[in-house]
Amino acid sequence: MNEQQALKKMIPPSKRREGAFLGGIIQIHVTRACDKACFGCTQGSNLGGKTGMIPLDLFEQAVISLKNYFGVVGIFGGNPALHPKFSDLCKILIKHIPFERRGLWCNNPKGNGWVMRETFNPRVSNLNVHLDKEAYDEFKRDWPESHPFGLDKDSRHSPVYVAMKDVIGDESERWRLISQCDVNQKWSAMIGVFRGELRAWFCEIAGAQSIIHQWDNEYPDTGVMVDENWWKLPMQEFSSQAKKHCHDCGVPLRGYGSLAQDESGIEQVSATHAEVYQLKRPDRAIQLVQLRSEVSEQSLKSFVSYIQNSEK
């Protein structure tokens, strides 16, 4: 399969996704900081280094760009509750987006349960506590309508930062896999801050790669400018992102990975990301993957079914 054939099968932010909340989700990434260090975190919250916080003016610009979006506007991290101006972020979101479309992706309220209750629709939020009973209890106490999960089941995270281009030489085979990517077909686009500027990506993993690599002066700025029409762009307008980030990604491999909270788990990374993949917890094991077979490819039916995958 070639690039153009793959792009025709891929889903831009403007197209409704089957099974997604309200037919679609666009995340606003507010910080990479997190109180957890889950194995294989898609947003690199298991890594050390700088963890920026989105400024309020850029956050409001991001929110305004999505006023006419049909789906959920998600607040995303990291753990968004660690943003020092979390309550101000919530006020901005309330100002521009109706309750039905306001979603939160958060593992621990960190004392913000009351403002979360006022701000977010629990039916379109994702509150995975990653086996943390204190976080679960705080959600239920301060936001009784919320639906936290992950108290009794861990999540299996497939290795995202094993770049396909490092383990699959055949570009046409990579495009074939990219055209079937679970994140593109089922998850979300993302707005975030790259080198101090607001940018948008058709995929949350593309955005994460950019944020993690942004301190490399030679790393390209692939994000699109954020205005009220950015999310309406056709997939062809995101082709430069796909050419860069999809081949630098491991999602389509559906590798077996590790349980998010498994203390004996092994992080996996390939050469493309090895320099920036410096773990927040240096005591953890890390494997430099060089062969496709090392990730136990296609062990999982779907990358995004992380709770169900914990049973495999």
Q: Each predicted region: which residue ranges?
A:
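Conserved alpha-helical substructure of the radical SAM core
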Residues: M1-C106, G111-V115, Q268-S299, F303-S310
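Short, charged low-complexity linear segments at domain edges
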Residues: E3-G23, P144, F149-A163, G207-K232
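Short N-terminal micro-motifs specific to bacterial/archaeal maturation
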Residues: H29-R32, K50, L127, S172, ...
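Flexible, active-site-proximal loop/turn residues at the rims of small-molecule/cofactor binding pockets
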Residues: L47, N79, K133, G207, ...
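Conserved AdoMet/S-adenosylmethionine-binding subsite of the radical SAM
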Residues: V63-I64, N68, L82-I211
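Accessory C-terminal segments flanking Radical SAM cores
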Residues: E171-L279, I286
